[in-house]
Amino acid sequence: IDAAIESKFVGYHDLTHDSKVTVLTTADALVDELKEGMEGTILVEETPFYATMGGQVADTGVIRTANAEFVVEDTIKLQGTKIGHVGKMTKGSIKVGETVTLAVDEARRNLIANNHSATHLMQKALRMVLGNHVEQAGSLVDPDKLRFDFTHFSPMTPEEIAKVEEIVNQEIQNGLDVVTNEMTIDEAKKTGAMALFGEKYGDTVRVVQMGDFSSELCGGTHVKNTSNISAFKIVSESGVAAGVRRIEALTGAGLIAHFNQVEETLKEAAALLKVSPADVVKRITALQEEVKTL
């Protein structure tokens, strides 16, 4: 691919955008046209699609013209400044030089944004509860959940987990506006914005601020207001390496689905024990006592 070809990301504000096709490829060759049924990668001048980066998964969606449709299954960074839309032509054909409409799956993007913004709130809450030694050691943000690895020397207690949840949910309820600003790395450091330990940053960085509560250097996509996240719950906390802990957590729609699943399991257990859900623990305790006397 020509080194002079670049792709500009315009997806912080626009989820639908018209742009010109600059490159088409199949798995093994550059082509002038992708036809129906073909799998390949499309590059354009400007795209609203976010490529996998900084722990945040890629956008999916469609690229279309009046007569053609390409389903985007993945978005990847190529040769630094190029963004490739990987997928399959499901209708018609698209040629190099054609103007296409790129449309990100908005519902999915919003779920990812909920989880990414919740990660920022949680990192601040972890530092408040556990101490300033907490540093991000890894992160995954997808539509279903968030996973966060951080430096800490021991398992979190139930009380510490509950306190982190309480702080995050309070800031969600507080409805903090999420504001992003671009500035030099020196300016960002002066504002006290949190940076990733060991990360190499360019001259200009993006600072994501959530009210007066959280400020971090981040290139990801976020909610406009913390109230969009709805609710937050930590579902697991475990060790992944010496001095590194991992949290998995859910927000919004993912959390409701989790609660529904847990409730269904509880109802099934209650039915098997022939008691109400509220009496499940009491019945299991009684059965354990019976077993001891056998």
Regions found by a protein language model. Give the residues of each.
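A glycine- and charged-residue-rich anion-binding loop/surface
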Residues: 1-294
